[in-house]
Amino acid sequence: MKILALEFSSPQRSVAIVQSGAFHEALGSNEPFAMIAEALREAKLEREQLDCIAVGLGPGSYTGIRSAISIAQGWQLARPIPLLGVSSAEIIAAQAQAGGLVGRVRVIVDAQRGEFYLAGYELTANGSREAEPLRIVSAAAVTQRASAGETLIGPEVTDWFPTGKTIFPRAAILGQLALGRTDFISGDKMEPIYLRETQFVKAPPPRQLG
């Protein structure tokens, strides 16, 4: 299977073509379609030869994730192609495991408003497994875990917690996670992972005059 992977949830955006375990990756903050063209060129593939598009759904940069989803949606409208969505927290954990990290880790991503997304993963020589579901916690809760010696990983995590390990989610790992998966989704159902409720103010009832 030839997979186009788009991971735009962090400041270090990446695009990759993954096929048969090999990958060709473009990193940086370049224009997305230029990065896609670079990855296709390195893989010696045409757009029409792709079998699937995988998208990192966050949590992370809402604008970046929306951009990746829009590209996947537009691609599917132009030419029917299966789409896959993968949690960026899962990508970070898998990347840490591929880098040799083992044991229990907590993936930490900035959720703004003084809060953080947190998910726990168990890393072994055979892979990574979710041990704590993703949720939003206070900065104090993360500080308490750091003080207890827990391993914190994530993009820019050391900006807040100096003992953490900075790991950006990469499209190459996303593509490898997508290999063999069949939980495809239609473009109109693909949404960023965003655990907050939508904030809105209900309009007051109209005043009666007279």
Residue ranges and their predicted role:
Residues 33-36, 67:
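Short, conserved active-site loops that position catalytic residues or coordinate cofactors/metal ions
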Residues 52-83, 88:
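DPxDG-like acidic metal-binding loop motif
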